[in-house]
Amino acid sequence: MARFGLPALLCTLAVLCAALLAAEPKSKSCSEVRRLYVSKGFNKNDAPTHEINGDHLKICPQGYTCCSQEMEEKYSLQSKDDFKSVVSEQCNHLQAIFASRYKKFDEFFKELLENAEKSLNDMFVKTYGRLYMQNSELFKDLFGELKRYYVAGSVNLEEMLSDFWARLLERMFRLVNSQYHFTDEYLECVSKYTEQLKPFGDVPRKLKLQVTRAFVAARTFAQGLAVARDVVSKVSVVSPTAQCAEALLKMLYCSHCQGLVSVKPCYNYCSNIMRGCLANQGDLEFEWNNFIDAMLMVAERLEGPFNIESVMDPIDVKISDAIMNMQENSVQVSQKVFQGCGPPKPLPAGRISRSISEGAFSARFRPYHPEERPTTAAGTSLDRLVTDVKEKLKQAKKFWSSLPSNVCSDGRMAAGNGNEDDCWDGKGKSRYLFAVTGNGLANQGNNPEVQVDTSKPDILILRQIMALRVMTSKMKNAYNGNDVDFFDISDESSGEGSGSGCEYQQCPLELEHNATEPSGKSANDQAGSAGGLVRARPSLLAAFCILLLVMQREWR
Protein backbone atom coordinates (compact mmCIF):
# COMPACT_ATOMS: atom_id res chain seq x y z
CA MET A 1 0.00 0.00 0.00
CA ALA A 2 2.86 2.30 0.79
CA ARG A 3 4.37 1.88 -2.65
CA PHE A 4 1.17 3.29 -4.20
CA GLY A 5 0.97 6.23 -1.75
CA LEU A 6 3.13 8.74 -3.62
CA PRO A 7 1.71 8.15 -7.12
CA ALA A 8 -1.83 8.29 -5.73
CA LEU A 9 -1.09 11.55 -3.99
CA LEU A 10 0.38 13.04 -7.16
CA CYS A 11 -2.66 11.99 -9.20
CA THR A 12 -4.99 13.49 -6.63
CA LEU A 13 -3.11 16.80 -6.71
CA ALA A 14 -3.19 16.84 -10.52
CA VAL A 15 -6.96 16.31 -10.56
CA LEU A 16 -7.47 19.08 -8.01
CA CYS A 17 -5.29 21.49 -10.02
CA ALA A 18 -7.22 20.70 -13.19
CA ALA A 19 -10.51 21.29 -11.39
CA LEU A 20 -9.30 24.61 -10.03
CA LEU A 21 -8.10 25.72 -13.45
CA ALA A 22 -11.43 24.73 -14.99
CA ALA A 23 -13.31 26.71 -12.36
CA GLU A 24 -11.50 29.95 -13.25
CA PRO A 25 -12.71 32.15 -16.17
CA LYS A 26 -11.35 31.16 -19.54
CA SER A 27 -9.90 34.63 -20.04
CA LYS A 28 -8.85 37.13 -17.44
CA SER A 29 -7.66 39.63 -20.02
CA CYS A 30 -9.42 43.01 -20.24
CA SER A 31 -7.55 44.10 -23.36
CA GLU A 32 -10.66 44.56 -25.55
CA VAL A 33 -12.50 46.46 -22.81
CA ARG A 34 -9.46 48.65 -22.34
CA ARG A 35 -9.15 49.30 -26.09
CA LEU A 36 -12.78 50.42 -26.40
CA TYR A 37 -12.48 52.53 -23.27
CA VAL A 38 -9.44 54.36 -24.66
CA SER A 39 -11.16 54.79 -28.05
CA LYS A 40 -13.74 57.00 -26.33
CA GLY A 41 -10.98 59.39 -25.28
CA PHE A 42 -10.52 58.16 -21.72
CA ASN A 43 -7.21 57.60 -19.93
CA LYS A 44 -5.88 54.07 -20.43
CA ASN A 45 -4.43 54.12 -16.93
CA ASP A 46 -8.00 53.93 -15.59
CA ALA A 47 -8.51 50.51 -17.20
CA PRO A 48 -6.94 47.36 -15.73
CA THR A 49 -5.25 44.90 -18.07
CA HIS A 50 -6.83 41.93 -16.27
CA GLU A 51 -9.90 41.37 -14.14
CA ILE A 52 -9.89 42.77 -10.64
CA ASN A 53 -12.16 42.46 -7.62
CA GLY A 54 -15.29 44.59 -8.15
CA ASP A 55 -16.21 45.50 -4.59
CA HIS A 56 -15.69 49.16 -5.47
CA LEU A 57 -18.48 49.19 -8.08
CA LYS A 58 -21.66 51.05 -7.09
CA ILE A 59 -24.01 50.33 -10.01
CA CYS A 60 -22.54 47.56 -12.13
CA PRO A 61 -22.53 43.97 -10.81
CA GLN A 62 -19.73 43.31 -8.34
CA GLY A 63 -17.40 40.32 -8.53
CA TYR A 64 -14.46 40.02 -10.87
CA THR A 65 -14.58 42.95 -13.28
CA CYS A 66 -12.72 44.85 -15.97
CA CYS A 67 -13.91 48.21 -14.60
CA SER A 68 -12.17 50.37 -12.08
CA GLN A 69 -14.03 52.93 -9.99
CA GLU A 70 -12.88 55.68 -12.38
CA MET A 71 -14.20 53.72 -15.35
CA GLU A 72 -17.64 53.31 -13.79
CA GLU A 73 -17.83 57.03 -13.07
CA LYS A 74 -16.79 57.99 -16.59
CA TYR A 75 -19.07 55.38 -18.14
CA SER A 76 -21.92 56.92 -16.13
CA LEU A 77 -21.29 60.31 -17.72
CA GLN A 78 -20.83 58.71 -21.14
CA SER A 79 -24.11 56.80 -20.93
CA LYS A 80 -26.00 60.04 -20.22
CA ASP A 81 -24.30 61.73 -23.18
CA ASP A 82 -25.14 58.77 -25.43
CA PHE A 83 -28.78 58.92 -24.36
CA LYS A 84 -29.03 62.69 -24.87
CA SER A 85 -27.38 62.39 -28.27
CA VAL A 86 -29.74 59.73 -29.63
CA VAL A 87 -32.87 61.47 -28.28
CA SER A 88 -31.63 64.77 -29.68
CA GLU A 89 -31.03 63.22 -33.10
CA GLN A 90 -34.56 61.83 -33.18
CA CYS A 91 -36.09 65.17 -32.17
CA ASN A 92 -33.77 67.36 -34.24
CA HIS A 93 -34.86 65.64 -37.41
CA LEU A 94 -38.50 66.46 -36.68
CA GLN A 95 -37.64 69.96 -35.49
CA ALA A 96 -35.72 70.61 -38.73
CA ILE A 97 -38.74 69.53 -40.77
CA PHE A 98 -41.05 71.99 -39.03
CA ALA A 99 -38.42 74.75 -39.13
CA SER A 100 -37.84 74.37 -42.88
CA ARG A 101 -41.57 74.17 -43.66
CA TYR A 102 -42.29 77.24 -41.54
CA LYS A 103 -39.55 79.12 -43.39
CA LYS A 104 -40.98 78.11 -46.76
CA PHE A 105 -44.52 79.10 -45.81
CA ASP A 106 -43.38 82.37 -44.29
CA GLU A 107 -41.41 83.28 -47.41
CA PHE A 108 -44.28 82.21 -49.64
CA PHE A 109 -46.93 84.28 -47.86
CA LYS A 110 -44.76 87.38 -47.64
CA GLU A 111 -43.77 87.21 -51.29
CA LEU A 112 -47.36 86.53 -52.27
CA LEU A 113 -48.32 89.84 -50.67
CA GLU A 114 -45.41 91.64 -52.31
CA ASN A 115 -46.34 90.23 -55.71
CA ALA A 116 -50.03 91.07 -55.30
CA GLU A 117 -49.15 94.66 -54.42
CA LYS A 118 -46.78 94.92 -57.39
CA SER A 119 -49.40 93.45 -59.73
CA LEU A 120 -52.05 95.92 -58.53
CA ASN A 121 -49.65 98.84 -58.87
CA ASP A 122 -48.66 97.85 -62.42
CA MET A 123 -52.27 97.33 -63.45
CA PHE A 124 -53.60 100.55 -61.92
CA VAL A 125 -50.77 102.67 -63.35
CA LYS A 126 -51.66 101.41 -66.84
CA THR A 127 -55.41 101.63 -66.27
CA TYR A 128 -55.85 104.84 -64.27
CA GLY A 129 -52.52 106.60 -64.73
CA ARG A 130 -52.03 109.88 -62.86
CA LEU A 131 -55.33 109.47 -61.05
CA TYR A 132 -54.05 106.32 -59.36
CA MET A 133 -50.66 107.82 -58.64
CA GLN A 134 -52.32 110.68 -56.75
CA ASN A 135 -54.19 108.20 -54.54
CA SER A 136 -51.69 105.33 -54.43
CA GLU A 137 -51.07 105.72 -50.68
CA LEU A 138 -54.57 104.35 -50.08
CA PHE A 139 -53.58 101.03 -51.65
CA LYS A 140 -50.15 101.04 -50.06
CA ASP A 141 -51.87 101.35 -46.70
CA LEU A 142 -54.11 98.39 -47.56
CA PHE A 143 -51.20 96.08 -48.29
CA GLY A 144 -49.23 97.48 -45.39
CA GLU A 145 -52.02 96.51 -43.00
CA LEU A 146 -52.32 93.04 -44.56
CA LYS A 147 -48.59 92.52 -44.06
CA ARG A 148 -48.81 93.79 -40.51
CA TYR A 149 -51.61 91.35 -39.76
CA TYR A 150 -49.63 88.41 -41.10
CA VAL A 151 -46.46 89.36 -39.24
CA ALA A 152 -47.87 90.56 -35.92
CA GLY A 153 -51.61 89.84 -35.93
CA SER A 154 -52.32 93.27 -34.43
CA VAL A 155 -54.91 94.23 -37.04
CA ASN A 156 -58.67 93.76 -37.06
CA LEU A 157 -59.11 92.62 -40.65
CA GLU A 158 -62.81 93.42 -40.94
CA GLU A 159 -62.42 96.92 -39.54
CA MET A 160 -59.36 97.55 -41.68
CA LEU A 161 -61.13 96.48 -44.89
CA SER A 162 -64.23 98.51 -44.03
CA ASP A 163 -62.00 101.53 -43.48
CA PHE A 164 -60.32 100.94 -46.86
CA TRP A 165 -63.64 100.94 -48.73
CA ALA A 166 -64.83 104.00 -46.81
CA ARG A 167 -61.68 105.91 -47.74
CA LEU A 168 -61.95 104.74 -51.35
CA LEU A 169 -65.59 105.87 -51.49
CA GLU A 170 -64.56 109.27 -50.18
CA ARG A 171 -61.93 109.64 -52.94
CA MET A 172 -64.26 108.30 -55.62
CA PHE A 173 -67.20 110.47 -54.59
CA ARG A 174 -65.01 113.58 -54.81
CA LEU A 175 -63.75 112.56 -58.24
CA VAL A 176 -67.13 111.79 -59.82
CA ASN A 177 -68.56 115.01 -58.36
CA SER A 178 -65.55 117.25 -58.81
CA GLN A 179 -67.76 120.34 -59.40
CA TYR A 180 -68.83 120.33 -55.75
CA HIS A 181 -67.14 121.12 -52.47
CA PHE A 182 -67.56 118.47 -49.78
CA THR A 183 -66.88 119.03 -46.11
CA ASP A 184 -65.73 116.26 -43.81
CA GLU A 185 -69.18 116.23 -42.21
CA TYR A 186 -70.80 115.75 -45.61
CA LEU A 187 -68.48 112.86 -46.49
CA GLU A 188 -69.28 111.27 -43.14
CA CYS A 189 -72.93 111.40 -44.13
CA VAL A 190 -72.03 109.79 -47.46
CA SER A 191 -70.40 106.87 -45.69
CA LYS A 192 -73.66 106.15 -43.85
CA TYR A 193 -75.27 105.25 -47.17
CA THR A 194 -72.53 102.77 -48.10
CA GLU A 195 -74.40 99.65 -47.03
CA GLN A 196 -77.69 100.83 -48.48
CA LEU A 197 -76.40 102.04 -51.85
CA LYS A 198 -73.60 99.50 -52.33
CA PRO A 199 -71.58 101.85 -54.58
CA PHE A 200 -68.93 99.17 -55.15
CA GLY A 201 -71.43 96.40 -55.75
CA ASP A 202 -70.99 93.17 -53.83
CA VAL A 203 -67.19 93.20 -54.08
CA PRO A 204 -66.47 94.63 -50.58
CA ARG A 205 -68.63 92.05 -48.81
CA LYS A 206 -67.22 89.10 -50.74
CA LEU A 207 -63.64 90.31 -50.55
CA LYS A 208 -63.89 90.95 -46.82
CA LEU A 209 -65.08 87.39 -46.24
CA GLN A 210 -62.48 85.85 -48.55
CA VAL A 211 -59.54 87.90 -47.30
CA THR A 212 -60.39 87.42 -43.63
CA ARG A 213 -60.80 83.66 -43.86
CA ALA A 214 -57.72 83.19 -46.07
CA PHE A 215 -55.43 85.37 -43.96
CA VAL A 216 -56.61 83.86 -40.69
CA ALA A 217 -56.00 80.34 -42.00
CA ALA A 218 -52.62 81.23 -43.53
CA ARG A 219 -51.30 82.99 -40.46
CA THR A 220 -52.62 80.37 -38.06
CA PHE A 221 -51.09 77.57 -40.12
CA ALA A 222 -47.71 79.30 -40.20
CA GLN A 223 -47.93 79.94 -36.46
CA GLY A 224 -48.77 76.26 -35.94
CA LEU A 225 -45.62 75.20 -37.76
CA ALA A 226 -43.61 77.58 -35.58
CA VAL A 227 -45.21 76.22 -32.39
CA ALA A 228 -44.47 72.64 -33.43
CA ARG A 229 -40.87 73.61 -34.18
CA ASP A 230 -40.45 75.27 -30.78
CA VAL A 231 -42.13 72.49 -28.79
CA VAL A 232 -39.90 69.82 -30.31
CA SER A 233 -36.83 72.01 -29.84
CA LYS A 234 -37.51 72.55 -26.14
CA VAL A 235 -38.47 68.96 -25.37
CA SER A 236 -35.47 67.52 -27.23
CA VAL A 237 -33.14 68.70 -24.45
CA VAL A 238 -33.41 65.90 -21.89
CA SER A 239 -31.92 65.81 -18.39
CA PRO A 240 -31.87 62.26 -16.98
CA THR A 241 -32.84 61.85 -13.34
CA ALA A 242 -30.46 60.06 -10.98
CA GLN A 243 -32.53 56.88 -11.30
CA CYS A 244 -32.56 57.15 -15.08
CA ALA A 245 -28.78 57.74 -15.15
CA GLU A 246 -28.18 54.57 -13.12
CA ALA A 247 -30.37 52.56 -15.47
CA LEU A 248 -28.57 53.98 -18.52
CA LEU A 249 -25.14 53.05 -17.11
CA LYS A 250 -26.33 49.56 -16.28
CA MET A 251 -27.80 49.13 -19.76
CA LEU A 252 -25.01 50.58 -21.90
CA TYR A 253 -21.70 49.89 -20.16
CA CYS A 254 -22.00 47.42 -17.28
CA SER A 255 -21.71 44.64 -19.85
CA HIS A 256 -18.22 45.95 -20.67
CA CYS A 257 -17.21 45.46 -17.07
CA GLN A 258 -17.93 41.76 -17.50
CA GLY A 259 -15.96 41.66 -20.74
CA LEU A 260 -19.11 41.36 -22.90
CA VAL A 261 -18.20 44.25 -25.18
CA SER A 262 -19.98 42.86 -28.24
CA VAL A 263 -23.24 42.00 -26.46
CA LYS A 264 -25.89 44.72 -26.89
CA PRO A 265 -28.80 45.43 -24.53
CA CYS A 266 -32.01 43.49 -25.12
CA TYR A 267 -34.58 45.50 -27.06
CA ASN A 268 -37.35 45.15 -24.46
CA TYR A 269 -34.87 45.91 -21.68
CA CYS A 270 -33.97 49.13 -23.50
CA SER A 271 -37.66 49.87 -24.10
CA ASN A 272 -38.46 49.79 -20.39
CA ILE A 273 -35.55 52.09 -19.58
CA MET A 274 -36.50 54.55 -22.33
CA ARG A 275 -40.13 54.58 -21.22
CA GLY A 276 -38.95 55.41 -17.71
CA CYS A 277 -36.43 58.04 -18.77
CA LEU A 278 -38.86 59.60 -21.29
CA ALA A 279 -41.99 59.26 -19.18
CA ASN A 280 -42.80 62.98 -19.25
CA GLN A 281 -42.26 63.23 -22.99
CA GLY A 282 -44.80 60.45 -23.39
CA ASP A 283 -47.42 62.69 -21.78
CA LEU A 284 -47.20 65.01 -24.80
CA GLU A 285 -48.78 62.37 -26.99
CA PHE A 286 -52.47 63.21 -26.50
CA GLU A 287 -52.24 66.96 -27.08
CA TRP A 288 -49.65 66.49 -29.82
CA ASN A 289 -51.96 64.22 -31.80
CA ASN A 290 -54.87 66.64 -31.33
CA PHE A 291 -52.64 69.45 -32.56
CA ILE A 292 -51.56 67.46 -35.64
CA ASP A 293 -55.20 66.68 -36.47
CA ALA A 294 -56.11 70.38 -36.19
CA MET A 295 -53.19 71.32 -38.45
CA LEU A 296 -54.36 68.83 -41.04
CA MET A 297 -57.87 70.32 -40.94
CA VAL A 298 -56.56 73.84 -41.56
CA ALA A 299 -54.36 72.46 -44.35
CA GLU A 300 -57.51 71.21 -46.06
CA ARG A 301 -58.99 74.71 -45.82
CA LEU A 302 -55.86 76.18 -47.38
CA GLU A 303 -56.23 73.79 -50.28
CA GLY A 304 -59.89 74.72 -50.69
CA PRO A 305 -62.08 77.70 -49.78
CA PHE A 306 -59.44 79.52 -47.68
CA ASN A 307 -56.68 79.42 -50.30
CA ILE A 308 -54.83 82.71 -49.85
CA GLU A 309 -53.20 82.38 -53.26
CA SER A 310 -56.55 82.28 -55.05
CA VAL A 311 -57.67 85.33 -53.04
CA MET A 312 -54.60 87.51 -53.50
CA ASP A 313 -53.78 86.76 -57.14
CA PRO A 314 -56.93 88.43 -58.56
CA ILE A 315 -57.33 91.11 -55.87
CA ASP A 316 -56.28 93.85 -58.28
CA VAL A 317 -59.01 92.90 -60.75
CA LYS A 318 -61.62 92.68 -57.99
CA ILE A 319 -60.81 96.14 -56.64
CA SER A 320 -60.81 97.54 -60.17
CA ASP A 321 -64.22 95.95 -60.80
CA ALA A 322 -65.49 97.69 -57.68
CA ILE A 323 -64.14 101.03 -58.89
CA MET A 324 -65.76 100.55 -62.29
CA ASN A 325 -69.05 99.66 -60.64
CA MET A 326 -68.90 102.90 -58.68
CA GLN A 327 -68.14 104.89 -61.84
CA GLU A 328 -70.94 103.32 -63.87
CA ASN A 329 -73.49 103.94 -61.13
CA SER A 330 -72.09 107.27 -59.99
CA VAL A 331 -75.10 109.32 -61.17
CA GLN A 332 -77.67 107.22 -59.32
CA VAL A 333 -75.44 106.96 -56.25
CA SER A 334 -74.83 110.71 -56.18
CA GLN A 335 -78.53 111.55 -56.58
CA LYS A 336 -79.52 109.34 -53.66
CA VAL A 337 -76.73 110.75 -51.52
CA PHE A 338 -77.79 114.32 -52.37
CA GLN A 339 -81.36 113.45 -51.37
CA GLY A 340 -80.26 112.00 -48.04
CA CYS A 341 -77.43 114.37 -47.13
CA GLY A 342 -78.65 117.50 -48.85
CA PRO A 343 -77.33 119.31 -51.93
CA PRO A 344 -73.60 120.01 -51.78
CA LYS A 345 -72.11 123.44 -52.33
CA PRO A 346 -70.87 124.07 -55.88
CA LEU A 347 -67.32 125.23 -56.33
CA PRO A 348 -66.68 128.73 -57.76
CA ALA A 349 -66.58 128.78 -61.57
CA GLY A 350 -62.81 129.16 -61.78
CA ARG A 351 -62.18 126.35 -59.35
CA ILE A 352 -64.68 124.07 -61.12
CA SER A 353 -62.78 124.10 -64.40
CA ARG A 354 -59.45 123.68 -62.63
CA SER A 355 -60.82 120.85 -60.51
CA ILE A 356 -62.26 119.04 -63.51
CA SER A 357 -59.02 119.36 -65.46
CA GLU A 358 -56.94 118.19 -62.50
CA GLY A 359 -58.97 115.36 -61.07
CA ALA A 360 -62.02 114.35 -63.08
CA PHE A 361 -62.48 110.61 -63.12
CA SER A 362 -62.61 109.62 -66.77
CA ALA A 363 -60.56 106.44 -66.87
CA ARG A 364 -62.37 103.39 -68.17
CA PHE A 365 -61.53 99.84 -67.26
CA ARG A 366 -59.40 98.06 -69.81
CA PRO A 367 -58.61 94.36 -69.42
CA TYR A 368 -55.07 94.05 -68.16
CA HIS A 369 -53.02 91.05 -69.13
CA PRO A 370 -49.52 91.18 -67.66
CA GLU A 371 -46.97 89.23 -69.65
CA GLU A 372 -46.07 87.15 -66.63
CA ARG A 373 -47.24 87.08 -63.04
CA PRO A 374 -44.41 87.33 -60.52
CA THR A 375 -43.49 84.00 -58.99
CA THR A 376 -42.38 83.39 -55.45
CA ALA A 377 -38.88 82.38 -54.45
CA ALA A 378 -40.33 79.17 -53.06
CA GLY A 379 -40.81 78.21 -56.70
CA THR A 380 -44.05 76.37 -56.09
CA SER A 381 -47.73 76.92 -55.50
CA LEU A 382 -49.50 76.91 -52.17
CA ASP A 383 -51.15 73.60 -53.04
CA ARG A 384 -47.81 71.88 -53.40
CA LEU A 385 -46.48 73.38 -50.20
CA VAL A 386 -49.57 72.26 -48.29
CA THR A 387 -49.41 68.76 -49.77
CA ASP A 388 -45.81 68.42 -48.63
CA VAL A 389 -46.57 69.63 -45.11
CA LYS A 390 -49.61 67.36 -44.80
CA GLU A 391 -47.40 64.37 -45.50
CA LYS A 392 -44.90 65.47 -42.86
CA LEU A 393 -47.67 66.10 -40.33
CA LYS A 394 -49.05 62.60 -40.81
CA GLN A 395 -45.58 61.15 -40.25
CA ALA A 396 -45.16 63.24 -37.09
CA LYS A 397 -48.30 61.87 -35.48
CA LYS A 398 -47.65 59.56 -32.51
CA PHE A 399 -44.05 60.78 -32.45
CA TRP A 400 -43.80 60.92 -28.65
CA SER A 401 -45.28 57.48 -28.00
CA SER A 402 -42.89 56.07 -30.62
CA LEU A 403 -39.83 57.88 -29.30
CA PRO A 404 -38.70 55.15 -26.82
CA SER A 405 -38.99 52.48 -29.51
CA ASN A 406 -37.21 54.66 -32.06
CA VAL A 407 -34.35 55.28 -29.63
CA CYS A 408 -33.99 51.56 -28.95
CA SER A 409 -34.07 50.83 -32.67
CA ASP A 410 -30.81 52.74 -32.96
CA GLY A 411 -28.01 50.19 -33.22
CA ARG A 412 -25.94 52.11 -30.68
CA MET A 413 -28.56 51.59 -27.98
CA ALA A 414 -29.86 48.03 -28.23
CA ALA A 415 -29.90 44.76 -30.11
CA GLY A 416 -32.54 44.18 -32.73
CA ASN A 417 -35.90 42.61 -31.99
CA GLY A 418 -34.75 39.33 -33.52
CA ASN A 419 -31.84 38.91 -31.11
CA GLU A 420 -33.72 38.25 -27.87
CA ASP A 421 -31.71 35.33 -26.50
CA ASP A 422 -28.13 36.57 -26.77
CA CYS A 423 -28.47 40.08 -25.39
CA TRP A 424 -27.60 42.00 -22.23
CA ASP A 425 -30.42 42.05 -19.67
CA GLY A 426 -28.64 44.19 -17.08
CA LYS A 427 -27.04 41.27 -15.28
CA GLY A 428 -25.61 39.05 -17.96
CA LYS A 429 -26.03 37.56 -21.41
CA SER A 430 -29.54 36.18 -21.32
CA ARG A 431 -33.13 36.58 -22.46
CA TYR A 432 -35.01 39.56 -21.02
CA LEU A 433 -38.11 38.30 -19.21
CA PHE A 434 -39.98 41.40 -18.04
CA ALA A 435 -42.95 42.86 -19.93
CA VAL A 436 -42.66 46.32 -21.47
CA THR A 437 -44.52 49.06 -19.59
CA GLY A 438 -46.78 51.62 -21.23
CA ASN A 439 -45.87 55.18 -22.22
CA GLY A 440 -46.36 58.24 -20.06
CA LEU A 441 -45.76 59.13 -16.45
CA ALA A 442 -48.81 57.33 -15.04
CA ASN A 443 -47.66 53.96 -16.42
CA GLN A 444 -44.22 53.97 -14.78
CA GLY A 445 -45.26 52.84 -11.30
CA ASN A 446 -44.39 49.24 -12.14
CA ASN A 447 -41.40 49.88 -14.39
CA PRO A 448 -38.91 47.10 -13.47
CA GLU A 449 -35.83 49.09 -14.55
CA VAL A 450 -36.31 52.76 -13.63
CA GLN A 451 -37.78 54.23 -10.48
CA VAL A 452 -40.00 57.13 -11.57
CA ASP A 453 -41.77 59.59 -9.28
CA THR A 454 -45.19 59.64 -10.94
CA SER A 455 -46.40 62.44 -8.65
CA LYS A 456 -44.05 65.10 -10.06
CA PRO A 457 -44.65 65.91 -13.74
CA ASP A 458 -42.01 67.97 -15.52
CA ILE A 459 -42.89 71.69 -15.58
CA LEU A 460 -41.34 72.24 -19.02
CA ILE A 461 -43.43 69.43 -20.48
CA LEU A 462 -46.59 70.82 -18.87
CA ARG A 463 -45.90 74.19 -20.50
CA GLN A 464 -45.51 72.57 -23.91
CA ILE A 465 -48.73 70.64 -23.40
CA MET A 466 -50.50 73.93 -22.67
CA ALA A 467 -48.92 75.58 -25.73
CA LEU A 468 -50.19 72.75 -27.93
CA ARG A 469 -53.65 72.91 -26.35
CA VAL A 470 -53.94 76.66 -26.95
CA MET A 471 -52.70 76.35 -30.53
CA THR A 472 -55.15 73.54 -31.23
CA SER A 473 -58.01 75.77 -30.10
CA LYS A 474 -56.81 78.53 -32.43
CA MET A 475 -56.57 76.03 -35.28
CA LYS A 476 -60.19 75.00 -34.80
CA ASN A 477 -61.25 78.65 -34.84
CA ALA A 478 -59.29 79.24 -38.04
CA TYR A 479 -60.79 76.11 -39.58
CA ASN A 480 -64.25 77.53 -38.95
CA GLY A 481 -63.30 80.90 -40.44
CA ASN A 482 -63.02 82.79 -37.17
CA ASP A 483 -60.12 85.07 -36.39
CA VAL A 484 -58.11 84.33 -33.28
CA ASP A 485 -56.07 86.30 -30.80
CA PHE A 486 -52.37 85.57 -30.97
CA PHE A 487 -49.24 85.97 -29.03
CA ASP A 488 -46.69 86.47 -31.75
CA ILE A 489 -43.79 84.06 -32.21
CA SER A 490 -41.58 86.65 -30.56
CA ASP A 491 -43.96 86.52 -27.53
CA GLU A 492 -45.29 89.98 -28.26
CA SER A 493 -49.01 90.13 -27.75
CA SER A 494 -51.13 90.77 -30.80
CA GLY A 495 -54.26 92.78 -31.17
CA GLU A 496 -57.75 91.40 -31.25
CA GLY A 497 -58.94 89.57 -34.31
CA SER A 498 -62.26 89.74 -36.09
CA GLY A 499 -64.86 87.07 -36.63
CA SER A 500 -65.98 86.27 -40.15
CA GLY A 501 -68.01 83.12 -39.56
CA CYS A 502 -68.75 80.53 -42.24
CA GLU A 503 -71.29 82.30 -44.39
CA TYR A 504 -70.48 80.47 -47.60
CA GLN A 505 -68.85 77.36 -46.20
CA GLN A 506 -70.78 75.15 -43.84
CA CYS A 507 -68.89 74.57 -40.63
CA PRO A 508 -68.97 71.14 -38.97
CA LEU A 509 -71.11 71.21 -35.87
CA GLU A 510 -68.82 68.87 -33.99
CA LEU A 511 -66.03 71.44 -33.83
CA GLU A 512 -66.52 73.60 -30.79
CA HIS A 513 -64.91 77.00 -31.02
CA ASN A 514 -64.99 80.41 -29.42
CA ALA A 515 -65.51 83.16 -31.93
CA THR A 516 -64.00 86.47 -30.99
CA GLU A 517 -67.27 88.30 -31.63
CA PRO A 518 -69.81 87.52 -28.87
CA SER A 519 -73.27 86.41 -29.90
CA GLY A 520 -76.44 88.15 -28.88
CA LYS A 521 -75.42 91.66 -29.94
CA SER A 522 -74.89 93.10 -33.34
CA ALA A 523 -71.70 94.94 -34.22
CA ASN A 524 -73.58 98.23 -33.97
CA ASP A 525 -74.92 97.33 -30.54
CA GLN A 526 -71.43 96.48 -29.37
CA ALA A 527 -70.03 99.69 -30.81
CA GLY A 528 -72.82 101.65 -29.11
CA SER A 529 -72.17 99.98 -25.80
CA ALA A 530 -68.45 100.64 -26.07
CA GLY A 531 -69.09 104.25 -27.00
CA GLY A 532 -71.42 104.70 -24.03
CA LEU A 533 -68.79 103.31 -21.72
CA VAL A 534 -66.16 105.66 -23.09
CA ARG A 535 -68.53 108.63 -22.76
CA ALA A 536 -69.44 107.62 -19.20
CA ARG A 537 -65.86 107.63 -17.98
CA PRO A 538 -65.19 111.40 -18.46
CA SER A 539 -68.40 112.28 -16.58
CA LEU A 540 -67.39 110.03 -13.68
CA LEU A 541 -63.95 111.60 -13.68
CA ALA A 542 -65.44 115.11 -13.63
CA ALA A 543 -67.73 114.23 -10.71
CA PHE A 544 -64.81 112.77 -8.83
CA CYS A 545 -62.73 115.92 -9.39
CA ILE A 546 -65.59 118.16 -8.12
CA LEU A 547 -65.92 115.99 -5.03
CA LEU A 548 -62.19 116.34 -4.35
CA LEU A 549 -62.40 120.15 -4.67
CA VAL A 550 -65.30 120.32 -2.21
CA MET A 551 -63.48 118.10 0.27
CA GLN A 552 -60.33 120.19 -0.13
CA ARG A 553 -62.24 123.33 0.83
CA GLU A 554 -63.73 121.59 3.85
CA TRP A 555 -60.27 120.52 4.97
CA ARG A 556 -59.07 124.10 4.80
Regions found by a protein language model. Name each.
Residues 2-80, 87, 286-556:
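Eukaryotic terminal intrinsically disordered regions
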Residues 21-361, 374-382, 397, 404:
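Extended alpha-helical scaffold/tether regions of large eukaryotic proteins
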